[in-house]
Amino acid sequence: MRHKVGQRKLHRSTSHRLAMLNNMVTSLLEHQAIRTTLPKAKEARKIAERIITLGKRGGLANVRLAARTVKDRDVLQKVFGEYKDRYASRPGGYTRIVRLGFRRGDAAEMALLELVDRPEKAAPVDTEAAAPAEETKAE
């Protein structure tokens, strides 16, 4: 029986799902906002909230626990430095999900997952667009 199982499988194997969510959380903590589908955003939010809470607690053991999810050392330093100070007085609820409507290709519901109290200049990263960035030619 599947009583009280509170996790979405997202139509992926366990290793694929965990790797995808870890990468999404790392991108969220690095760029402070990501654009993705609503179910993925809801799952990534759970992990991101836990990582920020570990950052607020500090300590070597919590750094090692967070490093299991966030592999980027610069992002870890940001969590245990900048975010620790930013969210010191907030008892939880560090992220916000804003619904963006439906994607044109497959009608999947899109959402913006962002950190609250973030600077307005930070633009969201589109996790769905795999198109290469256009480079300007130096003339």
Swiss-Prot record:
Part of the 50S ribosomal subunit. Contacts protein L32. InterPro entries: Ribosomal_bL17, Ribosomal_bL17_CS, Ribosomal_bL17_sf. This is Large ribosomal subunit protein bL17. One of its GO terms (cellular component) is cytosolic large ribosomal subunit. Belongs to the bacterial ribosomal protein bL17 family. The gene is rplQ. SUPFAM superfamilies: Prokaryotic ribosomal protein L17 (SSF64263). The keyword Signal does not apply. PANTHER family: LARGE RIBOSOMAL SUBUNIT PROTEIN BL17M, RIBOSOMAL PROTEIN L17.
